[in-house]
Amino acid sequence: MTTKPARSLAVMIPYLLAAIRMVDAGLASAEDIDTAMVAGCAHPMGPLALADLIGLDTTAAVAVSMYEETKEQLYAPPALLLRKVEAGELGRKTGRGFFPYH
């Protein structure tokens, strides 16, 4: 079986965006979401740490591209993600995203 990157992104991007929307809505903290996914689902890292690793600018760019192609709200980048990118909080590469990095 061959895995195409677009298929992987079709699953991963909504997962990341859902976690970002939860933080933006005040439903849970970034720490709580990531802890729940690591402890409760045995993921190696939570969705927000993963977004920080990928780069919030990259995550936003992929989401925008997928949204423009499909017009599905599932892929619409959350306002919090766009605010962080605009503020230069791009994740690990800038030392700050959803978590601080030293």
What spans do the regions from the language model cover?
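NAD(P)-dependent Rossmann-like dehydrogenase/reductase catalytic/cofactor-binding core
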Residues: M1-R7, I13-H102
